[in-house]
Amino acid sequence: GLGFESLAEHGKASDVCLKLFCYLWTMDRFEKYEDDLVDRLVVLCTGRGLMDGMLLSSPDITAKWESLALEYSGDAVREFNAYPEVVLAWTAYIGMAVACWWDKDWGRYKDQGYSSLVGPRGFDDLDEHVTRDILKHPLNSKEAADIAGNLAFLAGDAYSFMMRQGAEPQSVDAFNIFRHTLSAMYRVGAAIELKALRYRMEKI
């Protein structure tokens, strides 16, 4: 793995991660990595009927990730070594939730934080809370099962892609790859939901 064990020791993962995010956020040397990963995931999503060959987006949704990432980073770092693909899939669920909020009433939901995305068990049932309470799909529905299956597939591919970068564990490069992978999964999750809500790109 990318070796975040030392960050998670003694319950200090959140504080350390917040500082790292603030310090590293302006670094852009890994933007091409993120773009390449997004392009790859768009192809996979299109093959599964989740997209039409392009990444739907909105400036509001994209900008919202920065504040959510600062809150989410503590849980993401703590859980990543044991459950890397879960962390990546959960990030896509967050993107789907924000896209749903944006569609429903952005003025009402734009200030919602990470705590609004987790269920009674916190990080552990984020997927169920988003699916049932935000996207409004019963947990036993085909829609819920399809979302879970698709996001698990995409998370697995994204994890393989990030591992192939060969970053040294616990290095700055490893952390940058990690944060850009989260950003990519968020953007892809949002685009999947926008497509499900029947948005589409149009020439102007």
What are these regions (language model features)?
Residues C17-I204:
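Intrinsic-disorder/low-complexity detector
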Residues G1-H10:
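Short, positively charged low-complexity motifs
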